[in-house]
Every structure is written in structure tokens, then in C-alpha cells.
Amino acid sequence: MRLVIVLCLGATAVLGQAGNATLIRELEQRPDLTFIRTKQLSCKVKKFKPRLDLEFRLHTGYWVEIPFKELIGPETVWRMQLVVEPISPESAQPETIEQFVETGAVPETVKGTVEMSGSFAVGEGSYRATWHLTERFGRYCSVAWDVDAKRGRRDRDVPLALEPGEIRPARQYLFRQEEPVDRSLAGGDLNLKVFLNLDTGSRRRATVRPWLIAPMVAVMRTLFRRPEFGEFALVAYSQEDQKILYRSDYGDDFDFQAMGSAVRKLAPATVDFRDLARDSESNFIEELLSDELRNDDRADAIVFIGYEHWEGKKIPKERVTQLDLPRASVFYFNFAWHPWNSTLGKVVREWGGSQFRIRSARELLQAVEKVVDDTMVAR
């Protein structure tokens, strides 16, 4: 048996019964409180190397394992505290991550381990991380390790979002708005239209998994930050539900919060009987492209983003050619395992577009660079 507890910056998780909820609130208001330490527990830490994520941050984390036999006793409240101190550069400021967790009574018959994990993002540099677990009955454990955060040899030319020595939460609000971009020096006169397929897997799955949405949002953010683009249009849709969930005409930014609302409209566990009709999904894509591109003479670049796991029947070539061939450059960021077997993949190929499979920040940066370069040349 293994229980997993996750620690993130700014998060408070309460497990078990709510009997200690008032105590937890009181403890959260006492950051200076020191728990008495009388019995040291056996615990060990496993860490993972910092990796460059699609937000262009070095992301690192850890797992701490404690045998359940060490936790035998009545229900209690634990305080987990992670202190990350920059070693170099020395001028950087340390950060403290704290979380209170309530656990129910642990009987003597229970076996296995409890795993407590957490993560954070840093800029390049060296850090000392110290993790403490204490509880009000005096049990405690502490582990420490060093973190050496740097870009790999192949990523040396990839710019980072965090300064050396900077420490930030691993998790960010997925649909936060972007800061304005100064587009004056680069012209900012290219128009970008994005088709975003919000399906991330089987329609039988009851929930939408945010970590599968995150790479698609990262593509949109990287495109938005390019100063060559000045206006943006978005069509967010579900191929499985066969409907448009959100649409915005050309404007000076993407409305990420509205896109988040569109994601919450998804109902992947619900299947309409009309969705089961033969070729219904390919017909939906054909109609979507026809309606959206017929009268759009503003787009300089058309970008499709999404997962397409369904290997549907190919739209007949004669029907693809009947669609108005976009005057814009066409690109597809496809996160599926077999991208060219998807309906959209076949259409993009017929249109002579470029397709990308993104697995790293470097690949994302290179793909967006190609989108900009090809669009400027074609224009």
C-alpha cells in the first residue's frame, strides 16, 4: 500500500476527516510556530533533475518516502516545510514552501509506505533544499539535498523565463492572461488564426486532464509573445462533441480566461447518438474549415493545435480541393502519436502545410520560429 501526498507552493491539502480543520487554520496563521521535536522518523528522499519545461523554466522536484509503521498513532496534523536557498548567485532570495496535512488514525496493522512529493521551478544556479516534516506529538524527519539547475548542451540557446537564482511555484494558473508585448520594432502586422482542438483523449474519460491541455496553451503563449504578430483570432472546438466551444474574432490578444471557460464546457463522458454516425467527425472538420476560411482574407498564418487520436476516414481529396485553399501559411502542432493518420493531419498535408510534434522547449521554440519565418516569406 502506498499513499501519495503532493506539496506545491501556495497549496494546502487536508486529508482524512475534518476534525482538525480549525487547528489547521490556526496553524496557517502562525508561520513562526515551532513544533516540538522529540522522536526522529526514518525517511529518505529521491530527487529528479531539473528539466526545461514548455514554460521555459527549469522544473525540479522530489519524493520523500516514510514507512507507514513510523506513522502509527491517532489522527494528527503534520506540517511539511520546504526551504530552498540559493547557493549561487548569492544575491538571490530563499523561498519557503509550507503545507499542513491532516491524517486519520494509522492502525498497527497497516503496511507499506507513504510518499510525499513536491516540485518547484528555478532559474539557473545552485540551490540547497531542506525538507522538514513535524507534527504536534513531536515526531519529525528532515532531509536535505543540493540542486544544480542548468540548461543542457542542446538547450543553451533557449531563453529562460526565470532569472538565475529565482525560485517560483511549479504550478501556475493555466489560463492566466499574458502581459502586453511591444510589437513596434518587429512590425506586429501579421495576423494569426488558431484552431484549437480541446479533446485530449477518449470520450469515455469522465474528466479533462489539465496537464494535457497545458502543452497546447504553451504553444499559444509562445506564438502570442512573438512581436511579429499583431492580431489574433481563435476557434476552440471539440471534434468529439462536434461543436465550437469558443470563438473570438481578430483582436490584439488571446483571451485565455475565456478559453478556460470553454474547457470547462467539455463533457467527455457524454456521447450524443449523432456522434456515432459514420464519418461524423470528418464531416464536422470539413464544415468547420469551410465556414471559418471561406470569407477570412485576413489571416497570414493558420495554426492548428491539438491531439487527434482518432484515425478517421480520410476526407476525399476532391472535397479537400473544394475547400478554399487558404492564402495563409498553414501549420499544425499535433500532439498525437501518429499525426499524419488524423483527419486534420491529412488536410494540412494536402494543403502543403508544416506539421510539428513538440516534446521539448527547444522543439517548441524552433517550431514557432519556423511559423514566423515561413509566414513572413510567404507574405
Report residues per predicted region.
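Sec-dependent N-terminal signal peptides
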Residues: L3-A13
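Scaffold/interface architecture of coatomer-like assemblies
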Residues: G16-R379
